[in-house]
């Protein structure tokens, strides 16, 4: 019986060990205190609903309440930390929820909603994963964050420049000569550079279009794999990361005038068993897509009917013009209707 209880405790800790935390939020977005688990695949829907966008499926999660529909946040900042199930954040100022079914997710749907609704205002959309050298910048982010270090070589060079985190953060047991430590510190440098670059362009935080920031940090995970989670380096890195996240949340929250949502997702490891796996195209047995059995219509762009009508009526007008021209030429009398023949006959008479 005792063995069964221990096994169940480990199973529950494995399923609900990860966390979804709200570091900062305005008064118009209400997050309730509670221990309600949130599925990992629904985190993008939480971000979309908090910004006032609609989602495909209703979210029956009591953690997010209905706030002020006429006063939505100007920005959503989501930071995902890999390699740890939770961080020792200061109690009271942070609202945390258990995260179940930790599967990989992205905020592409939220970014698409921003692009479609605010295409003329060019909002800031920044999605960055420094450890994977993956960056996605659209709109005004291309001009604001063009000097942001995104590759591993750029991040390493940035650390050894002036005003870097190496000169201000207490490294303790971390070393500036270790590649794993430098990767972790470079991610903290990215957080500082984002808030610093945005502070130089404060007008972007005051426009009417919402902004989106999505950051994936894997440096702490690499330190845990290299030194071990019981090592002094891992404990020091966790403390440094907590302080850096708190400062980054305060900076982004203040830059947007207290009208920004800063969210944190801590995931020890993703559950790959819940991820849809791809199949080899050379396999003889193929699974047919269920959606194709219903003969669903293709999703066209909203500008398609406008362009279609323009092309259709222009082609109809050209066809009618061609028919009328051919009919008149076919029934034309060369001696009477043609100026060329008429002038030629007059010239002949005069001669």
Curated annotation (Swiss-Prot):
Expression by tissue: Expressed in the brain.
Locations listed in the record: Endoplasmic reticulum membrane; Lysosome membrane; Cytoplasmic vesicle, Autophagosome membrane; Cell projection, Dendritic spine membrane
Oligomer status and interactors: Interacts with renin. Accessory component of the multisubunit proton-transporting vacuolar (V)-ATPase protein pump. Interacts (via N-terminus) with ATP6AP1 (via N-terminus). Interacts with ATP6V0D1; ATP6V0D1 is a V-ATPase complex subunit and the interaction promotes V-ATPase complex assembly. Interacts with TMEM9; TMEM9 is a V-ATPase assembly regulator and the interaction induces the interaction with ATP6V0D1. Interacts with VMA21 (via N-terminus); VMA21 is a V-ATPase accessory component.
Topology with respect to the bilayer: Single-pass type I membrane protein
A Pfam family matched in the record: RENR_N
GO cellular component: autophagosome membrane; axon; clathrin-coated vesicle membrane; dendritic spine membrane; endoplasmic reticulum membrane; endosome membrane; external side of plasma membrane; lysosomal membrane
Its job: Multifunctional protein which functions as a renin, prorenin cellular receptor and is involved in the assembly of the lysosomal proton-transporting V-type ATPase (V-ATPase) and the acidification of the endo-lysosomal system. May mediate renin-dependent cellular responses by activating ERK1 and ERK2. By increasing the catalytic efficiency of renin in AGT/angiotensinogen conversion to angiotensin I, may also play a role in the renin-angiotensin system (RAS).
Signal sequence bounds: 1-17
Cytoplasmic compartment segments: 325-351
Species in which this protein is naturally found: Bos taurus (Bovine)
Keywords from the named record: Cell membrane, Cell projection, Cleavage on pair of basic residues, Cytoplasmic vesicle, Endoplasmic reticulum, Endosome, Lysosome, Membrane, Phosphoprotein, Postsynaptic cell membrane, Receptor, Signal, Synapse, Transmembrane, Transmembrane helix
Cross-referenced InterPro entries: Renin_r_C (IPR056780), Renin_rcpt (IPR012493)
UniProt-recorded name of the protein: Renin receptor
Post-translational modification: Phosphorylated.
Topology Extracellular: residue spans: 18-303
Sequence intervals crossing the membrane: 304-324
Residues carrying the site annotation Cleavage: 276-279
The organism's place on the tree of life at top rank: Eukaryota
Location of the motif Mediates retrograde transport to the ER: 347-351
Chief location bin: endoplasmic reticulum
GO molecular function terms listed in the Swiss-Prot or TrEMBL record: signaling receptor activity
GO biological process, one term: pH reduction
């Amino acid at each position: 019986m005792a063995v069964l209880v221990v096994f169940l405790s480990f199973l529950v800790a494995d399923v609900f060990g990860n966390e979804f935390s709200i570091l900062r939020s305005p008064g118009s977005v209400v997050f309730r205190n509670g221990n309600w688990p949130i599925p990992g695949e629904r985190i993008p829907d939480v971000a979309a609903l908090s910004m006032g966008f609609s989602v495909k499926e209703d979210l029956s999660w009591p953690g997010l309440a209905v706030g002020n529909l006429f006063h939505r946040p100007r920005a959503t900042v989501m930071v995902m930390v890999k390699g740890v199930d939770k961080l020792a954040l200061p109690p009271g100022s942070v609202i945390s929820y258990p995260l179940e079914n930790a599967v990989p997710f992205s905020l592409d749907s939220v970014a698409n909603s921003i692009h479609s609704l605010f295409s003329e205002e060019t909002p800031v959309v920044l999605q960055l994963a420094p450890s994977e050298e993956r960056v996605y910048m659209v709109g005004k982010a291309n001009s604001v964050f063009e000097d942001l270090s995104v590759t591993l070589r750029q991040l390493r060079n940035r650390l050894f420049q002036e005003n870097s985190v190496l000169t201000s953060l207490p490294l303790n047991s971390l070393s500036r000569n270790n590649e794993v430590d430098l990767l972790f510190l470079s991610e903290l440098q990215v957080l500082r550079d984002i808030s610093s670059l945005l502070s130089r362009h404060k007008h972007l935080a005051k426009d009417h279009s919402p902004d989106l920031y999505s950051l994936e940090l894997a440096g702490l995970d690499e330190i845990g794999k290299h030194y071990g989670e019981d090592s002094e380096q891992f404990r020091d890195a966790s403390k440094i990361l907590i302080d850096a996240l708190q400062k980054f949340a305060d900076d982004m929250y203040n830059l947007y005038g207290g009208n920004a949502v800063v969210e944190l997702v801590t995931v020890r490891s993703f559950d790959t068993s819940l991820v849809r796996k791809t199949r080899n195209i050379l396999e003889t047995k193929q699974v047919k897509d269920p959606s194709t059995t219903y003969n669903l219509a293709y999703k066209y762009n909203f500008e398609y009917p406008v362009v279609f009508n323009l092309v259709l009526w222009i082609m109809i007008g050209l066809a009618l013009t061609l028919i009328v021209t051919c009919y008149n030429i076919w029934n034309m009398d060369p001696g009477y209707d043609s100026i060329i023949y008429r002038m030629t006959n007059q010239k002949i008479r005069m001669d």
